[in-house]
C-alpha cells in the first residue's frame, strides 16, 4: 500500500529536480562561453529566481495540489477527487490550460512582472483624452467584483513624498546601451533558448503527473468493484455453509433440545458482515468443543465409578 503522501513527495521531487537542472544548465552555459564563475553565487542567484518564479506564478502549488488529491483518493478520501472528476474527465483540456497558464505566468515573473503588477493591470485600464495630457482611469469588471465582495481597502498611510529632479543625461545613456546591445544579443538568445528547453521539460513532467490522476481513479474503481464482488462471494459462501450445517443437523439422531440449541447458534451467524460471521463461527466451534469436552469428562467419570479402565489408541 502507498504511503499517505507518496504522490505529493513525488511532485516535490520533480520540482527539486527541475531546480537542479536549471543550476546545471546555467553553469554549463557559463563554461561554454569561457566565463569564470563562483558556483555558490550562481546557485544562490538561480535559487532566488527559481523560487520566486515558481511561487509567484503558482506553478509549484498546482502539481502539489493535484498530488494531494491523488493521495487522499488512495487513502479512501474521495471528496476532492469527485469534485474534480468532471473537469478532469477530458485530460487534454486541463493539460492544455495548465500548460498555457503556467507558461504565461513564468514568462511574466521572469521579466519582473510580479503578482502585484498583474493584479493591478487586470483591475484598471487607462483611457487617453484626445488633445490633453491627462487620462481617465477605468475600473474593470474584476475591480467591480472585488468592490462588491469587500476586497478593496483604503490605505491611510499614504505619504506625499517630494519628487526629485531627474538630471540623467538620457542621450548619453541611450548611446551606451546601444553599444552594449549587440554584444548582449547573442547571450540573451542563448539564455532564452536554454530557458525554453527547461520550460518544455517542466511542462512534460507536469503533463505526466496529470496523466496519473485518471489512471489512479480507474485503479480505485477496479478495486471497489473487486471488493464488492469478494464481499458478495463471502456472503453467499457463509449462507451456503449455514444452510448445509442446518440440513446435516436435522439428519442426526440427537435430542430435539440439543438440535434447537445448535440451530439457534448457527442462525445467530451474521451473513451480511463477513468479519462478524467469522467471529460467530469461532464462537459456535468453541461451544461445540466445550460440549464435547464436558461429555468426555462425564463418560470418564462413569467408567471410573464402574471400576473400569480406559485407554486411547489401539494396542
UniProtKB/Swiss-Prot annotation:
Residues 208-315 are annotated as: Interaction with host EIF4G1. Residues 150-206 are annotated as: Dimerization. SUPFAM superfamilies: NSP3 homodimer, Rotavirus nonstructural proteins. Residues 166-237 form a coiled coil. It comes from the Viruses. InterPro entries: NSP3_N_rotavirus, NSP3_sf, Rotavirus_NSP3. The keyword Metal-binding does not apply. The keyword Phosphoprotein does not apply. Homodimer. Interacts (via the coiled-coil region) with host ZC3H7B (via LD motif). Interacts with host EIF4G1. Plays an important role in stimulating the translation of viral mRNAs. These mRNAs are capped but not polyadenylated, instead terminating in a conserved sequence 'GACC' at the 3' that is recognized by NSP3, which competes with host PABPC1 for EIF4G1 binding. The interaction between NSP3 and host EIF4G1 stabilizes the EIF4E-EIF4G1 interaction, thereby facilitating the initiation of capped mRNA translation. This is Non-structural protein 3. It comes from Rotavirus A (strain RVA/SA11-Both/G3P5B[2]). The lineage of its organism: Viruses, Riboviria, Orthornavirae, Duplornaviricota, Resentoviricetes.
